[in-house]
Curated annotation (Swiss-Prot):
GO cellular component: cytoplasm; nucleoid
Protein's GO biological process: negative regulation of DNA-templated transcription initiation
Protein name: Transcriptional regulator MraZ
InterPro entries linked to this entry: MraZ, MraZ_C, MraZ_dom, MraZ_N, MraZ_sf, SpoVT-AbrB_dom, SpoVT-AbrB_sf
Assembly with partners or alone: Forms oligomers.
Amino acid sequence: MRKVRFRSRTEHTLDTKGRLNFPRRFSDVLESFESQDLIIAPFKTHLRIYPLAEWEELETKMHNHGGEQNLSGWVRYVVGGVVEAALDKQGRLLIPQTLRLDAGLEKNVVLNGMLSWIEIWDATAWASEQQAVRDGFEDFSEGLRNMGIL
């Protein structure tokens, strides 16, 4: 059976209450999970949305290895900032104000599928990030070769 993944990116606008119209292609992927519950987590320059099952796998990794390599501060930041969420009846996701402020999200945002999770970026920050990736594309060559992609 083919595993369903979050792929592609879309531009969206947050409404005045911080709600986001969740793209149908992402909600279709979400339907493949037992639970429709989501976890929204802060991640320095953006937010990440995880299906609950994916988040629980990450929590297990953090529990087993979070004390290693001085990761306790990172675990504290991420786990302390998570919010459990679900889509409303209109298919919208409420992004709490604390998380919007933390990630610098104002109105225009980009949702980017990352296979197991979705990123939410401020549109301006996303453009800067993409330019930095394009400028340093050669830096990925060795890793891509090791994966058999190049």
